[in-house]
Amino acid sequence: MAVQQNKKSPSKRGMHRAHDFLTTPPLAVESTTGEAHLRHHISPAGFYRGKKVTKGKGE
């Protein structure tokens, strides 16, 4: 079983965990409809980079 050699101080523990927080994904706004969507994904209306690629929800 692994056992630590020395106790890690609260400061060092915090530095170790500094990058473990969650971030919100960046959203893009569709130029034709103004809807927000994930980058590199189609919008809910079915547009991608200003062009209609699929049928949207409810169509």
UniProtKB/Swiss-Prot annotation:
<feature type="compositionally biased region" description="Basic residues">
    <location>
        <begin position="49"/>
        <end position="59"/>
    </location>
</feature>
<comment type="similarity">
    <text>Belongs to the bacterial ribosomal protein bL32 family.</text>
</comment>
<dbReference type="GO" id="GO:0006412">
    <property type="term" value="P:translation"/>
</dbReference>
<feature type="region of interest" description="Disordered">
    <location>
        <begin position="1"/>
        <end position="59"/>
    </location>
</feature>
<dbReference type="InterPro" id="IPR011332">
    <property type="entry name" value="Ribosomal_zn-bd"/>
</dbReference>
<keyword id="KW-0689">Ribosomal protein</keyword>
<dbReference type="GO" id="GO:0003735">
    <property type="term" value="F:structural constituent of ribosome"/>
</dbReference>
<dbReference type="InterPro" id="IPR002677">
    <property type="entry name" value="Ribosomal_bL32"/>
</dbReference>
<dbReference type="InterPro" id="IPR044957">
    <property type="entry name" value="Ribosomal_bL32_bact"/>
</dbReference>
<dbReference type="GO" id="GO:0015934">
    <property type="term" value="C:large ribosomal subunit"/>
</dbReference>
<protein>
    <recommendedName>
        <fullName>Large ribosomal subunit protein bL32</fullName>
    </recommendedName>
</protein>
<keyword id="KW-0687">Ribonucleoprotein</keyword>
<dbReference type="Pfam" id="PF01783">
    <property type="entry name" value="Ribosomal_L32p"/>
</dbReference>
